[in-house]
UniProtKB/Swiss-Prot annotation:
This is ATP synthase subunit alpha. Keywords: ATP synthesis, ATP-binding, Cell inner membrane, Cell membrane, CF(1), Hydrogen ion transport, Ion transport, Membrane, Nucleotide-binding, Translocase, Transport. It is found in: Cell inner membrane. NCBIfam families: atpA, PRK13343.1. ATP binds at G169, D170, R171, Q172, C173, G174, K175, T176. It comes from Burkholderia cenocepacia (strain ATCC BAA-245 / DSM 16553 / LMG 16656 / NCTC 13227 / J2315 / CF5610). SUPFAM superfamilies: C-terminal domain of alpha and beta subunits of F1 ATP synthase (SSF47917), N-terminal domain of alpha and beta subunits of F1 ATP synthase (SSF50615), P-loop containing nucleoside triphosphate hydrolases (SSF52540). GO terms for cellular component: plasma membrane; proton-transporting ATP synthase complex. F-type ATPases have 2 components, CF(1) - the catalytic core - and CF(0) - the membrane proton channel. CF(1) has five subunits: alpha(3), beta(3), gamma(1), delta(1), epsilon(1). CF(0) has three main subunits: a(1), b(2) and c(9-12). The alpha and beta chains form an alternating ring which encloses part of the gamma chain. CF(1) is attached to CF(0) by a central stalk formed by the gamma and epsilon chains, while a peripheral stalk is formed by the delta and b chains. Its main location: membrane. The record marks S373 as: Required for activity. It catalyses: ATP + H2O + 4 H(+)(in) = ADP + phosphate + 5 H(+)(out). The lineage of its organism: Bacteria, Pseudomonadati, Pseudomonadota, Betaproteobacteria, Burkholderiales.
Length: 513
């Protein structure tokens, strides 16, 4: 087969006309050094702070340092295959994570990739990991409670929806246990929970997930895990990723609860990244913006108004306010709350629950120090019945701790002081609670009522908890209607108070405890 010159030229013309050429203009640079997950890149002139960068082998990084002649970036994932001279491209995108109800019940990493072996997360939406917190105009005051089911917290340090309440204490004194009880108690309360594990052992995270599954809490919980074996970048990003996932529900008129366990590890990871990026160190070798690291995260937890939700959803959701409640955890060293990170987070949050190793070792669990634990806004959110009954408990405990210190040195105590000490011992005993056994509102109300009205005063201290349990069981079987009224109204009317008094007196006479 022979082609003449005219046919060849026609063929070439038709090929040229059919050619679709599109110019792919992308900013790219060259890797000049890789150390400890930090990459220095030359030639990336048009790059944003926090922009995703594409490395060879489908690996991504995050631009953090924008200098005159180079860019400092942190690698998200493995970096062993990246070497000097590799080409780096900009993506034009800020880091995003998947959001939506599809994530509920799943365990994901800091980038939203599933790590629970249950297949892909088919989330329809993604959202930026760094967002501006809602302004003052769009916020509402805290007025609805988050019931943790823990007697000492719900009575003395109440938490409201949209609040930031710090859980602070030394290692191994029950911080995670308090947070998990709060999640387990949200069953049937229309509250989505997000548990962010930062820098923990993989086995510890697995134990948490297993416990949440056993109690049925994974049905409304998302777990974001950046374990100790993950890179510092992943530990730094995990809280922001979890917060973005929680904001999805807040902005659509729903309520969410997020637990950061713990922010000390995030601060350590950020310090490591900053020092490797050659940023100037400050107090305790932390960078200058470590306060901003936590403030911009915790300010995103808020109760937003109906107008905000309506504007955000373009009128699809009306008349509903949303909230994101944050329970950050901070680990102290030898009870030192004056260290840099603890003082920062105490000043950002709306109160703190202070756990003490001495109380924990003395068998008072949860080991909450009632004297220094405080909730600055939660009182407005307390249920009526608990608010009525809890005032006396806090006073009794505070006076007991003060008197107990003096009583060690005094041999002859007057009757009033002795009475106060005895009451305090019983209240302290009453506030003990086993792990993973959160209480309902009526159960807390009954316990507080019994303590306030002196029904525990003539009991032996060792009998207090068995009396409380027996009383609850008795009310469940004989006074179900009274329980229902307290649960429905969240209040104790005059008639109900009379019925409760009679029930307690009858039970006490029976001696069935």
């Amino acid at each position: 087969m022979q082609l003449n010159p005219s046919e060849i030229s026609e063929l070439i013309k038709s090929r040229i006309q059919g050619l679709e050429a599109s110019a792919d203009v992308r900013n790219q640079g060259t890797v000049i050094s890789v150390t400890d997950g930090i990459v220095r890149i030359h030639g990336l002139s048009d790059v944003m702070q926090g922009e995703m960068l594409e490395f060879p082998g489908n690996t991504f990084g995050l631009a953090l340092n924008l200098e005159r002649d180079s860019v400092g970036a942190v690698i998200l994932g493995e970096y062993e295959h990246i070497s000097e001279g590799d080409i780096v491209k900009t993506t034009g995108r800020i880091l995003e994570v998947p959001v939506g109800p599809e994530l509920v019940g799943r365990v994901v990493d800091a980038l939203g990739n599933p790590i629970d072996g249950k297949g892909p997360v088919n989330a329809k939406l993604t959202d930026a990991i760094e967002k501006i917190a809602p302004g003052v105009i769009w916020r509402k005051s805290v007025s609805q409670p988050v019931q943790t089911g823990i007697k000492s917290i719900d009575a003395m340090v109440p938490i409201g929806r949209g609040q930031r309440e710090l859980i602070i204490g030394d290692r191994q004194c029950g911080k995670t246990a308090v947070a998990l009880d709060a999640i387990i108690n949200q069953k049937g309360k229309d509250l989505i929970c997000i548990y962010v594990a930062i820098g923990q052992k993989a086995s510890s995270i697995m134990n948490v997930v297993r416990k949440l599954e056993e109690t049925g809490a994974m049905e409304y919980t998302i777990v974001v895990a950046a374990s100790a074996s993950d890179s510092a970048a992943m530990q730094y990003l995990a809280p922001y990723a979890g917060c973005t996932m929680g904001e999805y529900f807040r902005d659509r008129g729903q309520d969410a609860l997020i637990i950061y366990d713990d922010l000390t590890k995030q601060a350590w990871a950020y310090r490591q990244i900053s020092l490797l990026l050659r940023r100037p160190p400050g107090r305790e070798a932390y960078p200058g913006d470590v306060f901003y690291l936590h403030s911009r995260l915790l300010e995103r937890a808020a109760r937003v108004s109906e107008e905000y939700v309506e504007k955000f959803t373009n009128g699809e959701v009306k008349g509903k306010s949303g909230s994101l409640t944050a329970l950050p955890v901070i680990e102290t060293q030898a009870g030192d709350v004056t260290a840099f990170v603890p003082t920062n987070v105490i000043s950002i949050t709306d109160g703190q629950i202070f756990l003490e190793t001495d109380l924990f070792n003395a068998g008072i669990r949860p080991a909450i120090n009632a004297g220094v634990s405080v909730s600055r806004v939660g009182g407005a959110a307390q249920t009526k019945v608990v608010k009525k009954l809890s005032g006396g408990i806090r006073t009794d405990l505070a006076q007991y701790r003060e008197l107990a210190a003096f009583a060690q040195f005094a041999s002859d105590l007057d009757e009033a002081t002795r009475k106060q000490l005895e009451r305090g011992r019983r209240v302290t005993e009453l506030l003990k609670q086993p792990q993973y056994q959160p209480l309902q509102v009526w159960e807390l109300a009954v316990s507080l009522y019994a303590a306030n009205n002196g029904y525990l005063d003539d009991l032996d201290v060792k009998q207090v908890l068995s009396f409380e349990k027996g009383l609850r069981d008795n009310l469940k079987t004989s006074h179900a209607d009274l329980i229902k009224r307290i649960e429905d109204t969240k209040d104790l009317s005059k008639d109900d108070e009379g019925a409760l008094r009679s029930a307690i007196e009858a039970f006490k006479k029976s001696g069935a405890y």
